[in-house]
């Protein structure tokens, strides 16, 4: 018996016998919501999270908080964007997300809990066979989204009038470090910006602390901004 215990005892010293099972894929809801509400997607049995973006002076510029059901549906989502003076707070109610304060129906849902329509803006979303949002459209614009085999968002292309804005992301080849990525932004096929992010990860392969470098190449000379992202995540 003691010989059978040796491998496990060795593993305890090295990595631990009872390791957290890592989920490498992203759910359709998490990936799609991260595209629309501009936050880093998370993996695994997330119960609630807060993602905070801070500038070089340590000032908060953006914060996204969410609570999720065990099935992976967003029960609530709150976005505070100080740079654009935007506040959004949504709560799930059957087939809609309501404004958390006025209780006005804001977003209609499809399927289990996926985005379908934003009536006030005339925006509708389309999904693929796996439930990922791949298109958004209104009278003024059309957007297409791309994902890799694990559901990680690879970018989007937005067409409006005579302008085409494309963002293409390249994640790390290490599947554990998906949120280590570079991205390039093109406007009418002309490069106007790039992004690089590197993170530290928890046992669920989710980012805890990240450095985000954004370079605006649309101005001369180019302007570089450095941000810090901090995540607090609770799991089921």
From Swiss-Prot:
Subcellular localization, as worded in the UniProt entry: Cell membrane
Lipid-anchored residues (N-palmitoyl cysteine): 17
Signal peptide positions (record): 1-16
Keywords: Cell membrane, Lipoprotein, Membrane, Palmitate, Signal
Topology in membrane: Lipid-anchor
Pfam family, one: UPF0257
Main location: membrane
Lipid modification (S-diacylglycerol cysteine), residues: 17
GO CC term, one of those recorded: plasma membrane
Annotated family: Belongs to the UPF0257 family.
Protein's name in the database: UPF0257 lipoprotein YnfC
Species per Swiss-Prot/TrEMBL record: Escherichia coli (strain 55989 / EAEC)
